[in-house]
Amino acid sequence: MADQEADTNIEIWKIKKLIKGLESARGNGTSMISLIMPPRDQVSRVTKMLGDEYGTASNIKSRVNRQSVLSAITSAQQRLKLYNKVPTNGLVLYTGTIVNDDGKEKKVTFDFEPFRPINASLYLCDNKFHTGALNELLESDDKFGFIVMDGNGTLFGTLSGNTREVLHKFTVDLPKKHGRGGQSALRFARLRMEKRHNYVRKTAELATQFYINPATSQPNVAGLILAGSADFKTELSQSELFDPRLQAKILNVVDVSYGGENGFNQAIELSAEILSNVKFIQEKKLIGKYFEEISQDTGKYVFGVEDTLKALEMGAIETLIVWENLDINRYELKNSTSGEIVVKHFGKDQETDQSNFHDAETNAELEVQEKMPLLEWFANEYKRFGCTLEFVTNKSQEGSQFCRGFGGIGGMLRYQLDMRTFDELSDGEVYEDSD
């Protein structure tokens, strides 16, 4: 998967996590503000609106609710002062007083520029945060290439979301099969084959021109659909002339009754299901490749928290694969006697075991300096280790096996490593597996 696509997937994971946290938050009265400003909105407009809202809220009869609402509006106003103008992709702001699980009130504020433009405009004061508008950020904007090829010509197009675009089309005049006998028949057959070959060659060359990004030498589409009414599409897909980088991206070869734009529309309809499952297919391929490394015992794989983190620190991991719901926290702990900082990773069960928070040799208490979900740490830090980060689900058979059998964390390595030779821990850092 291209780096840009992997980065987008991580941004989507961050938004999913944020939505989950926001949706579960509850407040007393209407003290929780949800504010979304689309690109090209004016900060001055929203500042004025908040000023008007402050005046209205001053009349709320309940003193407690009035104070909470006024506090939330003030908080939103303060946050907006940090922005001279609305960022390129818009601005999302959630602020207010929420009630914790233990019944205590806590002020929270989240503000960020989305990773892609958000088209919603929203202002609501309620006892919960409204996150519905953020869902549009989770929709895939993958671009797919379409090549519609028949005996009359070829069309090159792309589809992204609901937007289809024709990149180029050209017509071709191929000789028909001939009824003449003798020498002519052979000559005509040869000419026909030659023209046909040239047609496939031209289509293959244009496909590289339209679907390979010259800057990165990588495909600029998430997948390719080949369509047509004759067997040209099959011939193209199997041809040596067709770029192998694009060959690897073929998702489907479909029969359509027409060429040109009508054929393009028909190909989109016939491929709808496979396009909606593309993430699923990519995930199956990724984990399948990982399992292949294991079955062939190449030594270019790791699994489990401990080994994966060791390999990561060494810069050996090329692709880090993590289950998107991995429930492990990363702790930075300070030895109360020596002052030494150690890093440990615990699952839910280990967090309740107090012996994990005492030094094994001296029984000195290990004080928590920092605690954060390991997934979040990966999302923030993975680039530092020169790897790509892929979040996977447990919805496919492969994904489920990866989560159950390998603890939901592993990596494919740049080079062969025997993890057993790295039993000596370095830098005084202690990694504890979640199993």
UniProtKB/Swiss-Prot annotation:
GO terms for molecular function: translation release factor activity. Gene3D superfamilies: 3.30.1330.30, eRF1 domain 1 (3.30.960.10), eRF1 domain 2 (3.30.420.60). Coiled coil: none annotated. GO terms for cellular component: cytoplasm. InterPro entries: eFR1_2_sf, eRF1_1_Pelota, eRF1_1_sf, eRF1_2, eRF1_3, Peptide_chain-rel_eRF1/aRF1, Ribosomal_eL30-like_sf. The modification N-acetylalanine is found at residue 2. SUPFAM superfamilies: L30e-like, N-terminal domain of eukaryotic peptide chain release factor subunit 1, ERF1, Translational machinery components. It holds the Pfam family eRF1_1. SMART domains: eRF1_1 (SM01194). Keywords: Acetylation, Cytoplasm, Growth regulation, Protein biosynthesis. It is found in: Cytoplasm. The keyword Transcription does not apply. Directs the termination of nascent peptide synthesis (translation) in response to the termination codons UAA, UAG and UGA. Modulates plant growth and development. PANTHER family: PEPTIDE CHAIN RELEASE FACTOR SUBUNIT 1 (PTHR10113). Plants silencing ERF1-2 show increased elongation of the leaf petiole. Heterodimer of two subunits, one of which binds GTP. Interacts with OR. Belongs to the eukaryotic release factor 1 family. This is Eukaryotic peptide chain release factor subunit 1-2. It comes from Brassica oleracea var. botrytis. The gene is ERF1-2.
